[in-house]
């Protein structure tokens, strides 16, 4: 019934108010850890990249990001750290694209609309993952539009966006 749905929605909102910062910190720490793992796997598989100073610098930034999110006092601070780490990750992303039959070139992240084939693939994969998460969240009774990291915005499944953060880099491994 609608009344029960409203109760669940209220519980979700109350939970995110009470522990949203901790959820954001844990989500972003996991995102940075997973991103570091993807980079290390790429380095393991591509010996010629292991001594690349820019890649090593980004690994350090992501490591520091894990520590820094737990020092953050607001979700906005956490998201600022996430933005800084993402910007640095995407600064080396082109070097991480290996073993392709078709030459891909990536300079920087663009969205709405993506301006090159790599950005189009990123946006497509992220959209698929976000839609899958939104469906799963709705199935278990959560409101996918009410998240803890991403601000509420008309039409955005903020909770699904929050959940996808942790696995974004993993969703690209086999593409």
Segments and roles (model prediction):
Residues 10-172:
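Active-site helix-to-loop segments that bind/position phosphate- or nucleotide-bearing substrates
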């Amino acid at each position: 019934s609608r009344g029960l749905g409203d109760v669940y929605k209220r519980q979700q909102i109350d939970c995110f108010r009470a522990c949203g910062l901790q959820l954001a910190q844990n989500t972003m720490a996991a995102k940075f850890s997973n991103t570091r793992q993807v980079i290390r796997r790429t380095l393991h598989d591509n010996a010629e990249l292991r001594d690349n100073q820019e890649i090593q610098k980004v690994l350090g930034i992501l490591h520091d990001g894990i520590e820094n999110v737990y020092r953050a006092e607001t979700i906005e601070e956490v998201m600022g750290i996430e933005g800084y780490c993402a910007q640095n990750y995407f600064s080396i992303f082109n070097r991480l694209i290996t073993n392709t039959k078709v030459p891909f070139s990536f300079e920087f992240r663009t969205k709405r609309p993506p301006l090159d084939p790599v950005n189009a693939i990123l946006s497509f994969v992220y959209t698929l993952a976000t839609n899958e998460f939104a469906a799963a969240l709705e199935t278990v009774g959560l409101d996918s539009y009410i998240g803890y990291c991403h601000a509420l915005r008309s039409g955005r499944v903020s909770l699904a966006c929050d959940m996808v953060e942790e696995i974004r880099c993993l969703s690209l491994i086999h593409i």
